[in-house]
Amino acid sequence: MPIPRLMCTQHPDTTVKITAAEEVDEAIVAFTAYGCDEVMVDYEGKATPYSQPKEVVMKAAKSELPLGEKFVITVRLPNPRLEEFDRAMLALEAAVVANYFSVKYMGVRAVKWVVLPMVEDVETMSLVRRMLKRKVEDYKAEAKVDVGNIEVIPLFEDAFVQLKAKALLGEVFKGEEVREVRLFLGKSDSAVKHGHLASALAIAYTLSRLGDVESELGLRIRPILGMGSPPFRGGLNNPRLAPMEVVQYAGYYTATIQSAVRYDVALEEFLKVREAILNGCCAPRQRAPDEVLHIVQEASARYRALVMKYADKVIEVARLVPSTRDRVSWTAYGRTLTGGERVVNMPRAIVYTSAWYATGLPPTLLDAPYLLELAKSDKLDLVLKVLPTYLKELEYDLEFFDRATAEKYLDGEIVKAVVELADYLGLEARPNPAYATLLRMPRNEANIIALGKYRKFLG
């Protein structure tokens, strides 16, 4: 089958609670109603049953869906460097077992790829590839079933790792014949670590240089963009922003369809997003200049220094954000943010994003002080050339900025910078009265859900 274009995921970015027991039927609906040709069963920091890929196979067989031909299941593993080793091995086993049953009952391979998240080194990637190869060989030798080759997709989720894509891919695939490989670029975790500006520039730069990587390594790279609804997480699933984001992040082949765009917006709005993503696929993009690299470094440093000032407050609010999937708590599996000599355990991206919105200051606006510096040094035009949708993203998020609430939860310094930036850009910094009313109510789980329903995404 051809490489998929729309990957349905199990992200907890919706205000609607979806249990693991409901995810098998959800996968079938993704194939049949939402037009996704790929469903990602997720084990990263998530208590997904190891039988789930097999259950999707059996449900698809019963429904007479052409799994393995038109539709495919992709499994996201835990990274054995970050979670328990046995969880990664059990997730690999779940992928191979799914193929055992799909070959046995349908004569096709349902799983052609697994995703390894948080890739930062070649060794972990090589380990997973070796273990997967052994499992496949064991099934062929002992069960007499050829479950086929399953490829490992590296997921780069850090701005500086993405900028090293050429070196990492060269190590992983050196000596292999020319073929198509899939590369997953994640926006969300990179934004948590480095801020919106740095993470957006890193992905845009990386996408613009993949042609060089293909030529030098003899590969055909098919990029996957992992992005959600808010601008901080890429905005590619946002009905208002998607037609512009596909231009900003041109060069992708596949895009994620996360939960909020399926559960928190009307079907006709989802269809607009789907159409924009499909129409924007594979468009060429201009080569980003090397000057971007210095801005990525500076923006990341400024962002991390700023977030450290407010980390305790954001963590306090984050504890109120409900989980709408059966994920492991972020206190057990979160993200590490380093600023100076301080290291802070932060929530994962969706909870983190939701918490910032609940303070009255959307996280894209944390770059405001640095953006003012860029404007004064005549470098803002370079950013806007590489990120043509950036001003629209700021304009969008200023609708959820409330000065009084942000001053209450944070302080006047960051609020002043946001207001000054909005004035400089000629944008209005004022929320809808209904949303402002919700922001000024006491924070609790119900209030955070209500804020998310208004925005049409939790985080």
From Swiss-Prot:
Chemical reaction(s) catalysed: oxaloacetate + phosphate = phosphoenolpyruvate + hydrogencarbonate
Signal recorded as keyword: no
InterPro entries reported for this sequence: PEP_COase_arc-type, Pyrv/PenolPyrv_kinase-like_dom
Record-annotated disulphide pairs: none
Keyword Heme: no
EC number(s) reported in the record: 4.1.1.31
Listed GO MF terms: magnesium ion binding; phosphoenolpyruvate carboxylase activity
UniProt cofactor(s): Mg(2+)
GO process annotations (BP): carbon fixation; oxaloacetate metabolic process; tricarboxylic acid cycle
Stretches that traverse the bilayer: none
Pfam families, alphabetized: PEPcase_2 (PF14010)
Keywords, comma-separated and alphabetical: Carbon dioxide fixation, Lyase, Magnesium
Family assignment from sequence similarity: Belongs to the PEPCase type 2 family.
Quaternary context: Homotetramer.
Function of the protein: Catalyzes the irreversible beta-carboxylation of phosphoenolpyruvate (PEP) to form oxaloacetate (OAA), a four-carbon dicarboxylic acid source for the tricarboxylic acid cycle.
Official protein name in the record: Phosphoenolpyruvate carboxylase
Species annotation: Pyrobaculum calidifontis (strain DSM 21063 / JCM 11548 / VA1)
Gene this protein is translated from: ppcA
